[in-house]
Amino acid sequence: MYHKTQHHRYIPGLDGLRAFAVLSVITYHLNFNWANGGFIGVDIFFVLSGYLITSILLPAYGNDINLDFRDFWVRRIRRLLPAAYLMIFSTVVWVVLFDRELLHTVRGDAISSLFYMSNWWFIFHKLSYFDSFGSPSPLKNLWSLAIEEQFYIIWPMFLVVGMYIMKSRARLAAVISLLVLCSAVMMSVLYEPGGDPSRVYYGTDTRSFELLIGCALALVWPMKRLSSNRLPSKLKHTLHATEFLAFCILVLCVYFTDEYEPFLYRGGMLFISVTAAILIACVCHPSSFLGNLLSWRPLRWLGTRSYGIYLWHYPVIVLSTPVQEIGNPVFWHIVLKVIVTCILAELSYHFIEKPIRTQGFRSFSRRVFIHRIKEWKTTSVISKMSIGFIIFAILIFAGGLSGLAGEQKHPTKWTYSSQETNADTSQASGDKKNAAADKKHNPEQKTTDSNQGQKENKDSGQETHKKKDTQSQQLKKPADTAKEVLAIGDSVMLDISSHLRQSFSNVTIDGKVGRQMSQALELAREYKSFNQPNKAVIIELGTNGYFTNSQIEQLLQSFSKAHIYLVNTRVPRQWESKVNESLQQQAHAHQNVTLVDWHTEALQHPEYFTPDGVHLVPKGAKTLTALIVQAMKS
């Protein structure tokens, strides 16, 4: 038999805890500066899910689990799939009709989400949870549901076999504790400081310890036995102090935790999960004072709808937020997004989740669709043909848009060396055209151009814009303050590459979309020849994430004899201030390092940026290049 209803307690305080978790996640995704650690709401959800699912599977007394696996999995499917599939379908339709630029992103994400494998899809396609620009996936939040569903497939079998072998809940809890440590150690080992932590953040292997902590708690602290409301006053005071301390720790983590802090992945998440487990244990006790506070009706309402709220909030935010607004939220926009999310979650709860969970798919489909079919039979032939034509037209339209969305607009990596250009002066003009075409269709190819032709085009174009005299003069005349210049950067470096070529007669440019500081450390070995007093190195990094002080110091040490120009960043993400602070400290600490203050200039001119708030339009690229030239001349 399936032990779902036997001795099962409803604990309203857990709904309040769900509300706290989902609100933390929403504030994080809304990019509030005071909720940098709001993503820990997912940690709370994982621990709570492990606790509840194990409590449901375990009998109230004894160690024999008589479980109907098929019945369990069908119930999980009823609980999770309908609302998720509705959200996926609605999001795809919205993107097809109104936001076709996202189609190339959503297409694969939607398919992987249907099979609850999106977390591994994101890992294999290197989609960062923290720093994707230009085409953010509105389905990215489904990674956590994928982990839970994968866990629900494996855990019941493990629990039944484990109880059969161990014959004791305490011994099985000890085994699970070892698995917790293995998963946490794996997260620590796979994590690379200063790099993008998305691999360990998305991975089922590196996040399962949070679910397992909840499972172990259910074995040693079963909610079905916590029925006594009588505690000695001393123990009651201890309970109240413990739950208050645990809750305060989680609140402080929401405020202070940073997704790029190495501590988070080397014991920090384990600490947060254990704290969440302690809080859950306290709230489940009938004598819990905090449990009563969390039972406040509005919090319970949020908690019972937390699944739908979690599903809908992210696509609502992504599809309705201009990226230039990220980090600078508009109050009434936020209110509107929250209202829309709650309305969608309420509709999903009442018309999809609850009916299917209680009635099953067949009863629900009969109730909803049979009378619609009867109405369809009475519809005229002309009306039926019209509806069919509209559906067909939408499908054709969507297919056409999918083709457009699949085209890549910008190169992902580009390397330029003026030395190679000078060496290839005998190349025919037809070969140059072929090389340009190859560059367009193969962004990973290393390309060489003629610097002279581009410079002439630039000069002729600048003559028509006399309002930009200062910048134009700086760009027209090469700034030969160093015999050779090396420029290393990310996608912003790609944006300014053509202007750098026109400003420096002897420049090597190496830019790549998504480049992190950790990747630049490896790249520096290829450019050892630039570590000389008569050479200059421009470093433009920090767009894609935070880096440690040791990493930037190591990169600067690679070019300790050259003069280095650090370009600070303007990026609508939480790590912006930390990156710029670190760059400023390095500029003050090293005599051969100069800071190029792009951030101050960019803040005053939002028109310098494309709609993603990160990459540059031509005017912005000219301005940034002019700042670099000015810094090198001074």
From Swiss-Prot:
InterPro entries: Acyl_transf_3_dom, Acyltransferase_3, SGNH_hydro_sf. Residues 430-447, 455-470 have a biased composition (Basic and acidic residues). GO terms for biological process: lipopolysaccharide biosynthetic process. Keywords: Acyltransferase, Cell membrane, Membrane, Transferase, Transmembrane, Transmembrane helix. It is found in: Cell membrane. Pfam families: Acyl_transf_3. The chain crosses the membrane at residues 10-30, 38-58, 79-99, 110-130, 145-165, 172-192, 244-264, 270-290, 307-327, 329-349, 385-405. The keyword Electron transport does not apply. One of its GO terms (molecular function) is acyltransferase activity, transferring groups other than amino-acyl groups. GO terms for cellular component: membrane; plasma membrane. The keyword Membrane applies. Residues 413-481 are annotated as: Disordered. Its EC number is 2.3.1.-. Residues 414-429 have a biased composition (Polar residues). Belongs to the acyltransferase 3 family. This is Putative peptidoglycan O-acetyltransferase YrhL. It comes from Bacillus subtilis (strain 168).
